[in-house]
A protein has these predicted regions:
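Residues forming the flavin
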Residues: 1-176
Length: 176
């Protein structure tokens, strides 16, 4: 086949394969952006105005020091936080919301992502993101790490005791 332009959407899981195919055919590629972040869970009332008035709020902030783009993504009103597993059992966090009333929770969750564009000679942003996820998995034996905002501000890990005293009940029950 021949074409002036093609679109290929292989996703993160197919990126290594696609890069190999391109290299084998002499096709130049560009290093993409990697998004690294956390999933934030708050009580519904915190996000009530945005949840009622927007389908999905897209909040964007640029950091003053490095001008990094920080954004919200995948907001789940009255939803739950969930674990997803990638190749080799890599645990990552995601969120879901359900239409049915019986599955709704009292919490809203969303991803808070920092978008990083690296400069040459760096070529592997997806591998970089995976390495960060693997280090997180190492800290908590392959589970999802949970931390309250208060503990984050104090620079300490959240203990089960402090989590039980929190005014928000996390929807992901096996987080550590």
């Amino acid at each position: 086949y021949e074409a002036d332009e093609i679109v290929s959407a292989v996703g993160r899981e197919g990126a290594d394969w696609f890069s190999h195919i391109c290299n084998g055919h002499g096709i130049e590629t560009e290093v993409g952006t990697v998004d690294i972040g956390v999933r934030v869970e708050v009580r519904d009332e915190v996000m009530e105005f945005l949840n009622k008035n927007l389908y999905e709020a897209k909040l964007v902030y640029y950091t003053p020091t490095f001008d990094d783009k920080v954004r919200t993504f995948c907001t789940n009103p009255s939803g739950e936080v969930a674990t997803e597993y990638y190749e080799n059992g890599l645990a990552v966090v995601n969120g879901h919301a359900y239409k049915s009333q019986e599955f709704k929770t009292n919490n809203t969750n969303f991803a808070l992502l920092v978008s990083k564009n690296f400069t040459k000679p760096f070529k592997t942003p997806i591998e970089y993101g995976k390495q960060i996820a693997q280090l997180s998995n190492m800290l908590c034996d392959g589970k999802i790490l949970v931390q309250t905002y208060g503990d984050f501000k104090r620079g300490r890990r959240t203990t089960e005791e402090r989590l039980c005293r929190n005014n928000l009940i996390p929807t992901l029950k096996d987080a550590v």
